């Protein structure tokens, strides 16, 4: 009988010998490869934390002790050890979340997936324990790039100030972007001490620093300069101990016995302590180890034996953007690219291969990325910062006060905009158009197809006196949606076929095919509709108000929150223009959406063609009892421009 099937909770681990624990670790890796290959998910990070998670649950008593995972995609093993072994519907409707979930288990403290936050959570929980005189332990697991985020270092600065507050910080150093990216290293480390045992750490520590991405070699050289006249090296605990934090390590993150010993020492310490664990991302799975780019950080459905993806049909939005960026880079030397530790996921890997000196990976530091982009623009370049829509939320102040206030020509490309589905509440890009509506001067484009991604990206980078945003969906991009004409700066996708149309249907971004379907359904009900794509949804096109005035009702359809979104902006523009036409906005309701497929989520919130057509039909029926049709004709439609 496999050992894994006997684990129903953390305390079941207590009965296993070290030999059995090693066997369990291998069973877990086999399980993860088999399960995640069928559903997709974060495979590489979890293969790297198997022994570490086992040791954590043997040393600490969850849920009494709080074990928190930063970038919660590292929590699959934690789920398995806390009684959740049905991965058949991972990230699917009714199945396990891809991140910690309070609804799933009392062992999940926070539902986090945005990086670098766990130390702040842990600081607050530890303070609460101290005030309420509880003897519970708080353990924060951070790594897999999360220490490149400034928020983590803000928390460390506060944590280090309380020497008597118990808090265990486990640093999962998997060689993949573990790099505390901070400035002024020479000054910060000026008081580095040398230890009596530094000779034992010389070779190992130098290797640790030199293999640390981004800052490793410069850090070593800085230390060498800062300690000129003394020894040329310092043991790796220096950067943490100089902050006032006790340090244990480095520990082999795949040696359960060594891990348990180190964690037990940290548990007894009585103050904040760092346990530094060296792990291997993708451990035990050869295809992941051979993937130098990201060690199978996140995968779709794959063949478990080879790791090759199960083919998907058609191009995706991200690759269309990435290919156009290469073309722009070849045409314009001032085009540079920025990513926040997401080079491949946002499609900038091809640009980086062609222009390695014109791409900047700043780590998980969206705030810094936005301000650095402002500096690049002020210096005469045009930066394109590609980021998931949900992660731009973290840099709003910088977009507002550094980029927009200074009228910097920066282009933000928002990938995974709208409903993303399987990654759940934290990854839906459903707030960007609402948040960005308030930014003065900012221009926002929502392309409807691949051709428009290319065209509107080019339009965006031609703007040098204001921030521009291009946002698009996740996954495969559908067929081209041709325009039949243009009114102002808006593409007309369908003409009404009558001089007195009922509905002006405003389609935003990738929802163009849905809006054309809605128009077809309305037509069957005897309701005529004009379908337009504004292309640039901020600012509202000047032609919108006179066009709306020639219809009986305006309907907006957007893959964004209804609160403060495109519909709200158009309603305000109509009011400002004195146009008194009813407007009905359809979008995402103001609530967090659970994980499921995109189609299932859209159906759940009523954002489908049949649902919208039914409601619009009802609205027009009500108007028929109260108003007469206007007789004004629509202006002639100009031919579509290429």
From Swiss-Prot:
This is 1-deoxy-D-xylulose-5-phosphate synthase 2. It catalyses: D-glyceraldehyde 3-phosphate + pyruvate + H(+) = 1-deoxy-D-xylulose 5-phosphate + CO2. Its cofactor is Mg(2+); thiamine diphosphate. One of its GO terms (biological process) is thiamine biosynthetic process. Binds 1 Mg(2+) ion per subunit. Keywords: Isoprene biosynthesis, Magnesium, Metal-binding, Thiamine biosynthesis, Thiamine pyrophosphate, Transferase. Pathway: Metabolic intermediate biosynthesis; 1-deoxy-D-xylulose 5-phosphate biosynthesis; 1-deoxy-D-xylulose 5-phosphate from D-glyceraldehyde 3-phosphate and pyruvate: step 1/1. GO terms for cellular component: cytosol. Mg(2+) binds at residues 144, 174. Signal peptide: none annotated. The keyword Transmembrane does not apply. The gene is dxs2. Catalyzes the acyloin condensation reaction between C atoms 2 and 3 of pyruvate and glyceraldehyde 3-phosphate to yield 1-deoxy-D-xylulose-5-phosphate (DXP).
């Amino acid at each position: 009988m496999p050992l894994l099937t006997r684990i129903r909770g953390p305390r079941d681990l207590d009965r296993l010998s070290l030999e059995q624990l090693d066997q369990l670790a291998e069973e877990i890796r086999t399980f993860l490869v088999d399960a995640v290959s069928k559903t997709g998910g974060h495979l590489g990070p979890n293969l790297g934390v198997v022994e570490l998670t086992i040791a954590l649950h043997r040393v600490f008593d969850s849920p009494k002790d709080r074990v928190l995972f930063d970038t919660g995609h590292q929590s699959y093993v934690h789920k398995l050890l806390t009684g959740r072994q049905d991965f058949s519907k991972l990230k699917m409707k009714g199945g396990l979340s891809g991140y910690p979930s309070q609804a799933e288990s009392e062992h999940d403290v926070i539902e986090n997936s945005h990086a670098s936050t766990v130390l702040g959570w842990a600081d607050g929980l530890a303070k609460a324990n101290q005030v309420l005189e509880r003897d519970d332990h708080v353990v924060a697991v951070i790594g897999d790039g999360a220490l490149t985020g400034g928020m983590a270092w803000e928390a460390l600065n506060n944590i280090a100030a309380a020497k008597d507050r118990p808090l265990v910080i486990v640093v999962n150093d998997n060689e993949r972007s573990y790099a505390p990216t901070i400035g002024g290293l020479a000054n910060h480390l000026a008081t580095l001490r040398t230890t009596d045992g530094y000779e034992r750490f010389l070779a190992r520590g130098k290797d640790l620093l030199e293999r640390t991405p981004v800052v490793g070699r410069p850090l070593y050289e800085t230390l060498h300069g800062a300690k000129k006249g003394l020894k040329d090296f310092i043991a790796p605990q220096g950067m943490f101990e100089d902050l006032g934090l006790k340090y244990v390590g480095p520990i082999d993150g795949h040696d359960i016995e060594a891990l348990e010993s180190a964690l037990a020492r940290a548990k007894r310490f009585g103050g904040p302590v760092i346990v530094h664990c060296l792990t291997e991302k993708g451990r035990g799975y050869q295809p992941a180890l051979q993937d130098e780019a990201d060690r199978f950080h996140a995968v779709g459905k794959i063949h478990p034996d080879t790791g090759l993806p199960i083919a998907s049909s058609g191009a995706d939005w991200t690759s269309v953007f990435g290919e156009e960026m290469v073309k722009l880079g070849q045409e314009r030397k001032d085009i540079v690219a920025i990513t926040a530790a997401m080079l491949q996921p946002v499609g900038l890997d091809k640009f980086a291969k062609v222009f390695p000196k014109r791409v900047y990976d700043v780590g998980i530091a969206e705030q810094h990325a936005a301000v650095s982009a402002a500096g690049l623009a002020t210096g005469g370049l045009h930066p394109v910062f590609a980021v998931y829509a949900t992660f731009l939320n973290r840099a709003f102040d910088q977009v507002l006060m550094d980029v927009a206030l200074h009228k910097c020509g920066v282009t933000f490309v928002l990938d995974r905009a709208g409903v993303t589905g399987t990654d759940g509440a934290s990854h839906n890009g459903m707030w960007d158009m609402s948040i960005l509506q308030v930014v003065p001067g900012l221009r926002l484009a929502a392309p409807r197809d691949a051709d428009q991604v290319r065209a509107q990206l080019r339009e965006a980078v031609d703007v040098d006196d204001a921030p521009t945003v291009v946002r698009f969906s996740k996954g495969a991009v559908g067929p081209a949606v041709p325009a039949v004409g243009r009114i102002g700066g808006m593409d007309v996708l369908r003409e009404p076929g009558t001089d007195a149309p009922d509905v002006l249907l405003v389609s935003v971004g990738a929802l163009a095919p849905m809006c054309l379907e809605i128009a077809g359904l309305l037509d069957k009900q005897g309701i005529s509709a004009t379908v337009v794509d504004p292309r640039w949804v901020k600012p509202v096109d000047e032609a919108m108000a006179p066009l709306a005035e020639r219809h009986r009702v305006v309907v907006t359809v957007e893959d964004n929150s209804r609160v403060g979104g495109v519909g709200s902006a158009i309603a305000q523009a109509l009011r400002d223009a004195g146009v008194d036409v009813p407007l009905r906005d359809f979008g995402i309701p103001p609530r967090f959406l659970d994980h499921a497929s995109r189609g299932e989520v859209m159906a759940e919130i009523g954002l489908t063609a049949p649902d919208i057509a039914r409601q619009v039909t009802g609205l027009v029926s009500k108007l028929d009892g109260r108003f007469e049709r206007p007789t004004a004709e629509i202006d002639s439609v100009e031919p579509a421009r290429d």
